[in-house]
């Protein structure tokens, strides 16, 4: 009995063990299945949400990204990381959200693992000082220093100015010439506006007449509907009142050089000031260099107007200081290549208008205030007048900085203009054109793209043909007799160079695009006058108008380009459009010119630009101190 009972107990134990093991196996299988289901659900969610997010972002920043480049396993790993984590990134990471998923982006992150692509935007800063102190921006390279960095160079600059009797104007004085010391103002009366005299530095502002006299208001014209075909008044300030070169680029040149001098970076006893340009900036740089006791070198494209080279030959003694590079207006890359070669010699100090943020500062402080003065003047007689837009073509984009002030203080839209034959911003396009001084086939580093409101493209043919209308008896007679344009308005049209005509046409197109009326003013600038393009009109007369330019030709040009200025090739920008244009600049500045990615990316932040724009009074204090050390005049 005992033996039999033991057998029964043993059998039951075996059954229990088998059942228990089976239950364990079932539980394990269920757990595994549950894990698989969870994983599949997560994957499906990531794919659905991720695909939607990428489809949205793919409309932004796709300009010219390079899918053909490979960077090895690091880039492939970065691509995998992006796919797995794209939706886990902070929703404030705009730079990642606005750039398409592509091999090139993976390459960027592999190269720059600490870049701003995967960081939240930097907080706005009240001034540039804290930013430069952290080393997050190369202030030295881009001319944004606010302290003396080389005492010996500084002392030699002081000595040079003392020896040559040079006083430097402040930005505040150029913005408001009534603040220029009375003794300097009195002395200017005896000095020709085109003379190589240091006192002409105090004429580098908008308040001159054609003879160098001081005006209470910047000289300008208000273009009326009889000419423009739109009800909105278009206010045009004349840039050919600036001294020496008859163009406002002389202001940009002074703005770029003076901070380098008062911080001790530029030494007139050791350096040559090299001015890369498509024309007027090089002339302005040579003029400013001469007035400030420096040696200037002009680097410009060989196909610029004959008048530009004739001017340079008069001002430059050494022919080696005029360097011609291949191409025409849009061949700025060839200028950069030449400057890279020149920079190998430490005696050459490159003052690149496309990267010198002082160019932006000068126009924001001086041009912006002058144009504001014009708007306020006209609002006095029309209290309901609104400032609808500031319209200006982009060469270096310096002039567009004036729009920053007009936008922040008066709500004006900022509309950039380029040549239709080289529509870089509008269509990521390329090509050659003849609107000299603008449209250089890239996005300048100093262009605040993310604060821009619109882009307009204008054909160089329109500018060439209207240049004939504005500067021939037949054309002017047609405007007054057949179109009813006031004689006083027609008399000013000789103050419009090619890019000036471009600005006016873009303003007309902007007014039509926005549906503006008589109480909506647009403001722009005539950067230079027709006197710089006589040779271009000669070429037109010998070529396109070889059979003659009469009333019929004038009427055809006006019908097509003024009356026919429509809303084609106009884009008002949203965030996607701004980021598309901003991202395009990466290929010039980071890939070609070696700008650090963080330095490039920080320019998305309007806090950065606010800090840049607040540098003018800081530099003014340094200019006052510099003048005091020379002992030439009080300078205040």
Model-derived features: positions:
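Polybasic, low-complexity intrinsically disordered segments
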Residues: 50-51, 81, 99, 104-112
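Short, positively charged and aromatic/hydrophobic N-terminal segments
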Residues: 65, 107, 111, 115-116, ...
């Amino acid at each position: 009995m005992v033996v039999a009972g033991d057998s029964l107990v043993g059998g039951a134990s075996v059954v229990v063990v088998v059942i228990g093991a089976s239950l364990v196996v079932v539980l394990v299988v269920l757990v595994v299945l549950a894990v698989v289901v969870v994983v599949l659900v997560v994957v499906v969610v990531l794919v659905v949400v991720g695909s939607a997010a990428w489809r949205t972002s793919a409309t932004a920043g796709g300009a010219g990204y390079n899918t053909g480049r490979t960077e090895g396993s690091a880039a492939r790993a970065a691509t995998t990381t992006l796919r797995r984590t794209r939706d886990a990134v902070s929703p404030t990471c705009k730079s990642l959200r606005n750039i398409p998923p592509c091999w090139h982006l993976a390459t960027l992150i592999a190269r720059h693992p600490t870049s701003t692509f995967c960081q939240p935007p930097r907080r706005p800063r009240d001034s540039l000082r804290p930013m430069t102190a952290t080393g997050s921006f190369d202030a030295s390279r881009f001319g944004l220093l606010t302290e003396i960095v080389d005492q010996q160079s500084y002392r030699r600059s002081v000595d040079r100015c003392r020896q040559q009797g040079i006083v430097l104007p402040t930005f505040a004085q150029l913005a408001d010439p009534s603040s220029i010391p009375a003794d300097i103002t009195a002395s200017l009366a005896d000095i020709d506006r085109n003379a190589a005299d240091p006192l002409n530095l105090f004429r580098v502002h908008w308040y001159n007449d054609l003879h160098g006299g001081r005006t209470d208001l910047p000289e300008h014209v208000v273009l009326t509907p009889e000419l423009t075909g739109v009800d909105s008044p278009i206010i045009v300030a004349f840039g050919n009142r600036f001294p020496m070169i008859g163009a406002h680029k002389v202001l940009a040149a002074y703005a770029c050089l003076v901070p380098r001098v008062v911080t001790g970076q530029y030494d007139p006893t050791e350096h040559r000031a090299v001015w890369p340009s498509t024309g007027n900036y090089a002339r302005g740089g040579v003029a400013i260099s001469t007035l400030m006791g420096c040696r200037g070198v002009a680097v410009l494209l060989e196909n610029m107007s004959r008048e530009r080279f004739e001017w340079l030959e008069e001002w430059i003694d050494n022919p080696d200081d005029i360097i011609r590079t291949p191409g025409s207006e849009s061949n700025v890359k060839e200028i950069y290549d030449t400057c890279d070669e020149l920079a190998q010699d430490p005696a050459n100090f490159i003052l690149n208008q496309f990267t010198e943020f002082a160019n932006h500062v000068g126009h924001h402080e001086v041009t912006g205030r002058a144009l504001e003065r014009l708007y306020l003047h006209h609002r006095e007689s029309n209290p309901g007048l609104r400032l609808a837009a500031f319209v200006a073509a982009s060469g270096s984009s310096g002039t567009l900085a004036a729009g920053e002030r007009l936008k922040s203080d008066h709500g004006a839209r900022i509309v950039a203009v380029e040549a239709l034959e080289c529509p870089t911003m509008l269509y990521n396009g390329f090509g050659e054109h003849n609107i000299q001084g603008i449209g250089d086939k890239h996005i300048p580093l100093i262009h605040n793209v993310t604060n821009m409101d619109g882009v307009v493209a204008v054909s160089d043919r329109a500018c060439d043909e209207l240049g004939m209308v504005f500067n021939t008896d037949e054309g002017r007679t047609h405007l007054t007799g057949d179109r009813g344009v006031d004689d006083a308005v027609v008399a000013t049209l000789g103050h419009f160079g090619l890019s000036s005509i471009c600005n006016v046409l873009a303003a007309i197109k902007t007014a039509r695009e926005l549906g503006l009326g008589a109480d909506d003013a647009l403001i722009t600038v005539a950067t230079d006058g027709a006197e710089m393009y006589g040779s271009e009109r000669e070429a037109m007369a010998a070529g396109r108008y070889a059979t003659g330019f009469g009333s019929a030709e004038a009427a055809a040009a006006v019908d097509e380009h003024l009356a026919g200025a429509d809303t084609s090739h106009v884009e008002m920008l949203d965030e996607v459009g701004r980021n598309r244009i901003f991202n395009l600049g990466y290929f010039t500045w980071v890939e070609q010119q070696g700008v650090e990615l963080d330095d490039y990316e920080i320019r998305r932040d309007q806090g950065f630009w606010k800090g840049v724009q607040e540098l003018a009074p800081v530099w003014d204090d340094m200019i006052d101190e510099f003048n005091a050390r020379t002992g030439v005049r009080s300078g205040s």
